[in-house]
Amino acid sequence: MKQQRLGNKEVSAIGIGCMNVSWIWSNGAALDPVQRLESAIPAIHAGLDAGITLLDTADIYAPTWDDVGHNEVFVAEALRTWSGTKEQKDKVLIATKGGITRSEGEVWGRNGSLDYFLRAAEASAFRLGVEQLDLWQHHRLDPNINFETQFENVMVLKDRGLAKQVGVSNYDAQQLLKAIEIGGTPDQGGLVSIQNEFSPRYRHDLNVLEICEEYG
């Protein structure tokens, strides 16, 4: 399978987005994930058998507000039960995200504070069963905290060793350039990824893709 550099690691160019196992929108409502669990782990195993080495998750991917982290637990179990060798498992990169909040009554919000980032990253590492996250990405910006402070908080997770690498999600082109200015390029040990929606139907972030190609 074609490989792609992601910071200091080579991963498959095709990854598996695991959100649907725990949560998927259907006319504004979340579908029952239990209906998918029976076939979900074998499906992940099939992808890993085919050479996929990138799994995407997030702390917020969960059936309900009081089960945050559901998807991370699932991903950890899928990798744990895979028949691959230790060497093969070590090549798998799990990318998770944080920064969106869900509280009682399905109240959604965002929190870009350092205290929240630290707690979120530690909780994700616990659920994934690792001492250090492969890749932690800032899910969405908090409108109540200035941009520079938020991205500096992202870099703290790497500086303190909670995450091997850090990235962002749902940043526009100008925000991405500012993040690179603050944290540096992948070759400088800074930002290594951005996860935005992009497809033949949604091409509004083409300029973001061009920035990624420029900075590697």
Where are these regions (language model features)?
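N-terminal binding-site loop/beta-alpha segment at the start of enzyme catalytic domains
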Residues: 1-93
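Acidic (Asp/Glu)-rich catalytic clusters
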Residues: 8-10, 49, 76-93, 125-129, ...
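Beta/alpha (TIM)-barrel catalytic core signal, keyed to glycine-rich beta->alpha loops juxtaposed to Asp/Glu
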Residues: 23, 31, 141-216
